[in-house]
């Protein structure tokens, strides 16, 4: 990790908050930022920009959303907005998209979500539950970015995390609409 980045973050967040957010939490769910230190590097990047209006395309299980909301809350308190756009499950509308593997390999996670929480971890409902602490700061949109992204006022967005559909036309559309 670069020394200048750490100094900047220490100045922005203070020692206690810096130590707290350097650990990317997985909340007993799947995440695309699972490789060692990738989640931490991502949070450092976001913290260095201090966005107040964050857009995530491709929310998946909501792990990155929760980490980002925790970070933005530590920086701005309640003065931030998080917008998350995702398919939140398979449907006829998104049958052509490449859907990430939503199955858990760990049988305890299967039991936990199916019988304890009684919710599909990939559903809009499950992500809302994970983010309920920030219910006044979040706006989750269910749908395909090919049809919805152009309706979002990008002039109000400070930071975009693009991790949605991986099909060529979807990526091209997302980049064009940003």
Model regions and ranges:
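Membrane-proximal basic amphipathic "stem/tether" segments
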Residues: 1-34
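S-adenosylmethionine/decaboxylated-SAM
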Residues: 27-30, 35-178
């Amino acid at each position: 990790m670069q020394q200048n980045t750490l100094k900047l973050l220490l100045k922005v967040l203070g020692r206690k908050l810096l130590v707290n957010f350097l650990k990317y939490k997985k909340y007993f769910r799947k995440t695309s930022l699972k490789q060692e230190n990738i989640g931490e590097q991502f949070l450092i990047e976001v913290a260095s920009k201090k966005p107040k209006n964050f857009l995530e395309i491709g929310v998946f299980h909501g792990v990155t959303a929760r980490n980002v909301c925790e970070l933005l809350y530590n920086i701005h308190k309640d003065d931030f907005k998080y917008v998350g756009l995702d398919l939140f499950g398979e449907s006829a509308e998104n049958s052509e998209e490449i859907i990430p593997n939503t199955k858990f390999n760990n049988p305890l996670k299967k039991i936990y979500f199916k019988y304890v929480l009684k919710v599909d971890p990939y559903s809009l409902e499950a992500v809302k539950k994970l983010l309920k602490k920030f219910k006044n700061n979040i706006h989750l949109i269910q749908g395909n970015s090919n049809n919805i992204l152009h309706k979002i006022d990008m002039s109000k967005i400070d930071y975009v995390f693009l991790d949605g559909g991986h099909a060529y036309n979807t990526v091209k559309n997302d980049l064009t609409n940003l």
